[in-house]
């Protein structure tokens, strides 16, 4: 497995059917964090020509799509996954052509690591020497952040700092291009509609507050150390690979189960919440384009169209031939089918202590500067997700 340095610094093991690298060796970065250098253009060009990407959060929705994209473009892709008692690599297992016999010439490698462990991050950066870093790892569930605020800050805020500082400590500040997955939750209690790169932030959750620190520390390293460090302020983006606890996937999974007679109804929170939903596959293309631009900058990535959770439900149930009729208000609101069977209920337990009522992005800057524009519509997205979940639930009702 490639590590970018000596073979002796890499120890590998096979876990399940995936080979994971445990990187050792910190010497290259000791005492370097305060040195300043100007990298010659030829050296910089040769470094970047290697096309080596490091992805944190590679086992998630975005990480898996991004890995596919980068591999298709000829990159060597390294991903960081956390060691745990259970496997969470289902979204990326297909990227291994022959995982058991997979050796050093592979284009795809996984490494154990954690955003709370700075020494581990320094070792990985030192050994891999990535040309591009895509920082997607986070505790990204807004409601969970109210239950785990300190952990959310440790991973989402300080974790971003640790990764940036690992690059700086290894004297790769002027060579590595860094992408930080920022979020539309920064806008929270929105100050204008739609939201652009110039809209003031007003975070409304521990998650959003932690991500705001992440946003500004990226800007700080860009300005302080001349690092090619960028924020992608991504509005909600979904896919069949979306985590099961997020509202869109919760809806499409439940609709699939209902269509197969495995479930009767679904409980949700704020049905009136308005969101700008896009497809994750398109959004990772924007991430890549951000790092190919001539200069580092921050970009809103969004569709510019808005739907409520209620409308998302309507679209999902329409895919199984059911038209919902809505009755009541607030926690008393229900959605019934034509036979009067309640399909959607509202439960107070899914409300957040501070709600974000509306998010709508203005991605004109990305369109003009990067040539990026969302193409998949919400009805198309819902159709794909419901169809995928029906296939999943047919084969494995307990999934």
Curated annotation (Swiss-Prot):
Q: How does activity depend on temperature?
A: Optimum temperature is 30 degrees Celsius.
Q: Which gene encodes it?
A: bre-1
Source species, domain of life: Eukaryota
Q: Which InterPro entries match?
A: GDP_Man_deHydtase, NAD(P)-bd_dom, NAD(P)-bd_dom_sf
The record's EC number reads: 4.2.1.47
Please describe, based on the UniProt annotation, the reported consequence of changing residue 232 to E. In ye4; resistant to Bacillus thuringiensis crystal5B toxin and reduced brood size. Resistant to C.cinerea galectin Cgl2
The GO biological-process annotations, alphabetized, read as: 'de novo' GDP-L-fucose biosynthetic process; endoplasmic reticulum unfolded protein response; GDP-L-fucose biosynthetic process; GDP-mannose metabolic process; IRE1-mediated unfolded protein response; response to toxic substance
**Purpose of the protein:** Catalyzes the conversion of GDP-D-mannose to GDP-4-dehydro-6-deoxy-D-mannose. Involved in susceptibility to pore-forming crystal toxins in conjunction with bre-2, bre-3, bre-4, and bre-5. Involved in susceptibility to the nematotoxic C.cinerea galectin Cgl2, likely by contributing to the synthesis of N-glycans to which Cgl2 binds. Has a role in determining brood size.
User: What's this protein's name?
Assistant: GDP-mannose 4,6 dehydratase 1
| Source organism (scientific name) | Caenorhabditis elegans
Question: What pathway is this protein a component of?
Answer: Nucleotide-sugar biosynthesis; GDP-L-fucose biosynthesis via de novo pathway; GDP-L-fucose from GDP-alpha-D-mannose: step 1/2
* Reactions that this protein is recorded to catalyse: GDP-alpha-D-mannose = GDP-4-dehydro-alpha-D-rhamnose + H2O
Q: Which GO terms describe its cellular component?
A: endoplasmic reticulum; sarcomere; striated muscle dense body
Q: Write out the GO MF terms.
A: GDP-mannose 4,6-dehydratase activity
